[in-house]
């Protein structure tokens, strides 16, 4: 989806949400999705799956079949590079940069040499009260652990296929 069409569809989707008067968290509760995933769907950063269509249409009855069709196509998962200048996004990036090395070391200690997937991944934003009574933001990043593999030629399927003459 080209950038202009993506922006047009996104604007229409966000207008439907705005007209509904519902928050991302309310829509999440109605659809069984996380609030961040609902926001990603409406911003065309995630693909709407067929099983979710009825729940989303029930939560947002003003969604047209054309918009649903757009949401079901694979999204162009890009972002505006100027987005980093938005204060909330800047602070999230700053937090990851500040705590990143420590988080990585703890992942390595607890799991081994690997990474947290951003594909098999869940994210949510929650509001809680701190011990001081002030509102606190909880951002949960829940990703599958993926270990780095030792690159042994005996396990390299493309090499095995080349040697064996098969191309399946």
Swiss-Prot record:
Its EC number is 4.2.1.104. GO terms for cellular component: cytosol. Coiled coil: none annotated. Keywords: Lyase. One of its GO terms (molecular function) is identical protein binding. CDD domains: Cyanase_C. Gene3D superfamilies: Cyanate lyase, C-terminal domain, lambda repressor-like DNA-binding domains. It comes from the Eukaryota. InterPro entries: Cyanase (IPR008076), Cyanate_lyase_C (IPR003712), Cyanate_lyase_C_sf (IPR036581), Lambda_DNA-bd_dom_sf (IPR010982). It catalyses: cyanate + hydrogencarbonate + 3 H(+) = NH4(+) + 2 CO2. The active site is at residues 91, 94, 117. It holds the Pfam family Cyanate_lyase. One of its GO terms (biological process) is cyanate catabolic process. Catalyzes the reaction of cyanate with bicarbonate to produce ammonia and carbon dioxide. Belongs to the cyanase family. This is Cyanate hydratase. It comes from Arabidopsis thaliana.
